[in-house]
Curated annotation (Swiss-Prot):
Residues 1-22 form the signal peptide. Interacts with host laminin and vitronectin. Can interact with both immobilized and soluble vitronectin. Part of an ATP-binding cassette (ABC) transport system involved in metal import. Binds a metal with high affinity and specificity and delivers it to the membrane permease for translocation into the cytoplasm. Acts as an adhesin that promotes binding of H.influenzae to host laminin and vitronectin. In addition, interaction with serum vitronectin plays an important role in bacterial serum resistance. This is Putative metal ABC transporter substrate-binding protein Hpf. GO terms for molecular function: metal ion binding. It is found in: Cell outer membrane; Cell surface; Periplasm. One of its GO terms (biological process) is cell adhesion. It comes from Haemophilus influenzae (strain NTHi 3655). Residues 23-48 are annotated as: Interaction with host components. The lineage of its organism: Bacteria, Pseudomonadati, Pseudomonadota, Gammaproteobacteria, Pasteurellales. A divalent metal cation binds at residues 58, 123, 189, 264.
Amino acid sequence: MRNSFKIMTALALGLFAMQANAKFKVVTTFTVIQDIAQNVAGNAATVESITKPGAEIHEYEPTPKDIVKAQSADLILWNGLNLERWFERFFQNVKDKPAVVVTEGIQPLSIYEGPYKDAPNPHAWMSPSNALIYIENIKNALVKYDPQNAAVYEKNAADYAQKIKQLDEPLRAKLAQIPEAQRWLVTSEGAFSYLAKDYNLKEGYLWPINAEQQGTPQQVRKVIDLVRKNNIPVVFSESTISAKPAQQVAKESGAKYGGVLYVDSLSAKNGPVPTYIDLLNVTVSTIVKGFGK
């Protein structure tokens, strides 16, 4: 009996020690926030995403495993701006966990047509300057809920913010190669408003947001007319949706199909955009290449 008690005590102490030494755990709603948060957290915390690489995030359907994952977190980070329309109902099943919106302080652009007209465009991370606000909000959340690692988070956030700031000039130089008369970015989803605003591009798209009907005859006809009227040479699609509507527009308008852009999700680690910085670089390079520059 005495030996059994000693064993149980040792196991309990061991479990307590493991819990005491366990890293702070962050769960995010999608992979872009996961990568930004991991850069801020460094080795002081683990960061996991509910949605997997390549997943469609707007109308994601959470699973019981996702609830378990969120319940195991010390902190949950989500985008807000009506991106994750599933999140608030999902969060009702998660008890006593802090959830922080990482877009606080961003000036949102409005969706200008469709059922979501005048609602905020949620894809704010497509502006590097907005990414700095994401970094600051994530850092503040980590410092608040894991203060013992505050110095680590402060340093990592400053270092990562500097990397993001250094992206702007090369991205701007690449996009400046597109002639003024051709500076139209035509895509499937209207997810590039922030990128277009930052880098002086006009925007056209088949549907405003992925919750909409996608690739209806009316949408396709509207964009075909836009492309023809403005002599737009290239049309793009995005990685998390079908390319067929954009390809149809290209075929019927005489434009070129320029390939896949990345916005709503990172790729797997062995894919083309395993990080947020890769997402911006590859997307801009694909745009410029599509224009033949």
